């Protein structure tokens, strides 16, 4: 996500890199500890369930922040023994007896493990195919220049002892292992190496390569050509090297792969790639990574991970720098960003959600399914790239954005096909199913973050992973353990805050006497969950949001039949008069309780916001309440008079305001950002945002509850649309409720697109933090009405609320050797 020499990132360094290479580090091991964070009455103030079991048994919180911040600013890449070996085999141009990169040979000599192997061979890690591949490559490289006789001997002994691993089809393997490993075996034989392996076993491995080259079991012809170019070093003279050069990047590399680039040079077809290898070996002091550059992908992954784990706010400055640089890469159509499907899609998603002014034009290259099928991603069944495309397609801001529409259509279809045909790896299946079930616009951040924390992989769990799309095991130096520790600590701290705020809200309910209203669906936990789950930034914003959710729900129930016509008219007049309510009086105790709950709470919110707003903004809250109850009264009068609006438009003129988003957002907006002037609240933009949010809520509600509301004698947009197209010569008599719902979904989709466009654009009268509230409200509404009206069947909502506020995390923290957070 960064240019190589950007200020935010130097472009990637190996930890401890020097001209003499990197000495492998040995890591201590200890039993892991199960950590459970209890909520409610059983809140644990620490995560201590064993030795040093704090929020992270190990580093101080500041040290964790510093390590993550360092990785964000300066990508740390693991050296690849496999790729370094191939680079070491490149001769000086015109002299096949002299190595072009002696520093790479020196690194190989200095980085052999005691057991004779090369690669990622940490204590406790079982010998795998990646280690065998790296070891054979390094042995062949040393033999190529007749150096390191003892190293070669120890390496050959290691290969002989573990060769059975190469033949084990159940062992995880790097991409293209059957081709790259057998190619090295052939090369080893030609260089005179005597492998301590039965010739029949060697022949068996080479035969596997022959079978793979002859069959067409994987992908399309185009994807197969791309894949064979990617693993071309394993093909030797079997490769069409002119065809490989079609995949050369501007930097001279083949797929940004040092090994593939080195192979094309060795075979005399890519001397322009020498500049690429010169740069990479110079930058890292001899060794090379498995892919370079990969700054953009590495940093975008870090940003995405921090956001998904709920700790991105602690790194806002670094993330801003990364996204600024990513935006520049995007605008300049840089290959590092645009030529990799997963990187491009992730960049688009993050940039759009952070308000950068980009169109979907950069995604046009993926508008056809063939963009996946004919690529390496398709050949390797790369589900993660496909899933990233699907996620990005959901961020449409324009109804006529056919690019994202087409991407979303085919990517969802392919993912579903892969699920039904069981072509998705078991470890990836939950994430795919979750993404298909829960679209981006219906995900509540805190709920998803808890899920991500509990499923997050530590470094220990990642030891046998990381082979996707890479020829040698790439694990990077992403501080997974530190990220997990901070996320657990932050979630635990947040739960303590949430529980205290919920207690305060329960006290407020009693103080306002709302609990005396028998009809009131108060549900403080569920309503507070909607504020906590979307990560409203301050306590005051969460409290104001929740109080008004409770109030609007209670008032809505009052207008739905619990109040008489006289009482309803009385409440509307009281709210209209506001401070002069004493002139009117109360028609009942119920009206008095409702009015004073609304009135006093609104005044308290406005007074609390005065230090931020530099004025008393209670008039805006009062006005939003008046619009709300006026719409509710109109709907109640329709119901009591058995009047059916003649058009959907007439119905929506009251139903939009009556959905009651106004008081909730207006109150919370006073606490989320800069001062909101009179002009902001009166602006066309603010009014349009409010109308969109209310319309989204109304349509979602109507589509889920129309059957119940018809029985209650209430009108509904779905029913009205069906009626308007079923008789009187005004439309098709065959129109049905399902057809009406489809039309409402189309209108809903258009409103959602327009809302996202307004929220993510980089200009506007309404400040971005305030605009974001409308999108958060839309996400809550989509979540609530995703399957059914969860306010009437609240088990699912209560379970979700408990997950965020009360239920303990179930997570395993890695061991550490020093202090706690």
Curated annotation (Swiss-Prot):
<dbReference type="InterPro" id="IPR036965">
    <property type="entry name" value="Terpene_synth_N_sf"/>
</dbReference>
<comment type="pathway">
    <text>Secondary metabolite biosynthesis; terpenoid biosynthesis.</text>
</comment>
<feature type="binding site">
    <location>
        <position position="705"/>
    </location>
    <ligand>
        <name>Mg(2+) 3</name>
    </ligand>
</feature>
<dbReference type="InterPro" id="IPR001906">
    <property type="entry name" value="Terpene_synth_N"/>
</dbReference>
<dbReference type="InterPro" id="IPR008949">
    <property type="entry name" value="Isoprenoid_synthase_dom_sf"/>
</dbReference>
<keyword id="KW-0460">Magnesium</keyword>
<keyword id="KW-0456">Lyase</keyword>
<dbReference type="InterPro" id="IPR050148">
    <property type="entry name" value="Terpene_synthase-like"/>
</dbReference>
<dbReference type="Pfam" id="PF01397">
    <property type="entry name" value="Terpene_synth"/>
</dbReference>
<comment type="function">
    <text>Involved in the biosynthesis of ent-kaurene diterpenoids natural products. Catalyzes the conversion of ent-copalyl diphosphate to the phytoalexin precursor ent-isokaur-15-ene.</text>
</comment>
<protein>
    <recommendedName>
        <fullName>Ent-isokaur-15-ene synthase</fullName>
        <ecNumber>4.2.3.103</ecNumber>
    </recommendedName>
</protein>
<dbReference type="GO" id="GO:0010333">
    <property type="term" value="F:terpene synthase activity"/>
</dbReference>
<keyword id="KW-0479">Metal-binding</keyword>
<comment type="similarity">
    <text>Belongs to the terpene synthase family.</text>
</comment>
<feature type="binding site">
    <location>
        <position position="556"/>
    </location>
    <ligand>
        <name>Mg(2+) 1</name>
    </ligand>
</feature>
<dbReference type="GO" id="GO:0006952">
    <property type="term" value="P:defense response"/>
</dbReference>
<dbReference type="GO" id="GO:0016102">
    <property type="term" value="P:diterpenoid biosynthetic process"/>
</dbReference>
<dbReference type="GO" id="GO:0000287">
    <property type="term" value="F:magnesium ion binding"/>
</dbReference>
<feature type="binding site">
    <location>
        <position position="560"/>
    </location>
    <ligand>
        <name>Mg(2+) 2</name>
    </ligand>
</feature>
<feature type="short sequence motif" description="DDXXD motif">
    <location>
        <begin position="556"/>
        <end position="560"/>
    </location>
</feature>
<feature type="binding site">
    <location>
        <position position="556"/>
    </location>
    <ligand>
        <name>Mg(2+) 2</name>
    </ligand>
</feature>
<dbReference type="InterPro" id="IPR005630">
    <property type="entry name" value="Terpene_synthase_metal-bd"/>
</dbReference>
<feature type="binding site">
    <location>
        <position position="701"/>
    </location>
    <ligand>
        <name>Mg(2+) 3</name>
    </ligand>
</feature>
<feature type="binding site">
    <location>
        <position position="560"/>
    </location>
    <ligand>
        <name>Mg(2+) 1</name>
    </ligand>
</feature>
<keyword id="KW-0611">Plant defense</keyword>
<dbReference type="Pfam" id="PF03936">
    <property type="entry name" value="Terpene_synth_C"/>
</dbReference>
<feature type="binding site">
    <location>
        <position position="709"/>
    </location>
    <ligand>
        <name>Mg(2+) 3</name>
    </ligand>
</feature>
<dbReference type="InterPro" id="IPR008930">
    <property type="entry name" value="Terpenoid_cyclase/PrenylTrfase"/>
</dbReference>
<feature type="region of interest" description="Disordered">
    <location>
        <begin position="1"/>
        <end position="23"/>
    </location>
</feature>
